[in-house]
């Protein structure tokens, strides 16, 4: 009998990833109105046109560092799923403690 059995931890055959999404510059998904709403929440009244690209680049570097740390926690625990606690611990490691998600 082939397959992974009940545990699902084995290597198995792999199989084809049929619906693998092509990753392009997804940072453009953070739209101009979304950035404007975040700025409004922070109390900003007028926004320069140059702010949008700068905000996207800063957000991208911040998320890359948090995700890198969260994935490191996940790999250390020998898991494949990043949990909310991994993100909480990654943020805490960077000095940005987040409350309300356990830990």
From Swiss-Prot:
GO MF, any single term: protein heterodimerization activity
A Pfam family reported for this protein in Swiss-Prot or TrEMBL: CENP-T_C
Main localization of the protein described in the UniProt heading: nucleus
Modified residues (N6-glutaryllysine): 92
Record key words, sorted: Acetylation, Chromosome, DNA-binding, Methylation, Nucleosome core, Nucleus
Residue ranges: DNA binding: 17-21
Subcellular location: Nucleus; Chromosome
SMART domains the record matches: H4, TAF
Posttranslational modification: Glutarylation at Lys-92 (H4K91glu) destabilizes nucleosomes by promoting dissociation of the H2A-H2B dimers from nucleosomes.
In-chain residues carrying the UniProt-annotated modification N6-methyllysine: 6, 9, 13
Modified residues (N6-acetyl-N6-methyllysine): 6, 13
Gene Ontology CC annotations of this record: nucleosome; nucleus
Function: Core component of nucleosome. Nucleosomes wrap and compact DNA into chromatin, limiting DNA accessibility to the cellular machineries which require DNA as a template. Histones thereby play a central role in transcription regulation, DNA repair, DNA replication and chromosomal stability. DNA accessibility is regulated via a complex set of post-translational modifications of histones, also called histone code, and nucleosome remodeling.
Family assignment from sequence similarity: Belongs to the histone H4 family.
Self-association and partners: The nucleosome is a histone octamer containing two molecules each of H2A, H2B, H3 and H4 assembled in one H3-H4 heterotetramer and two H2A-H2B heterodimers. The octamer wraps approximately 147 bp of DNA.
Protein name in the entry: Histone H4
Organism from which the protein derives: Blastobotrys adeninivorans
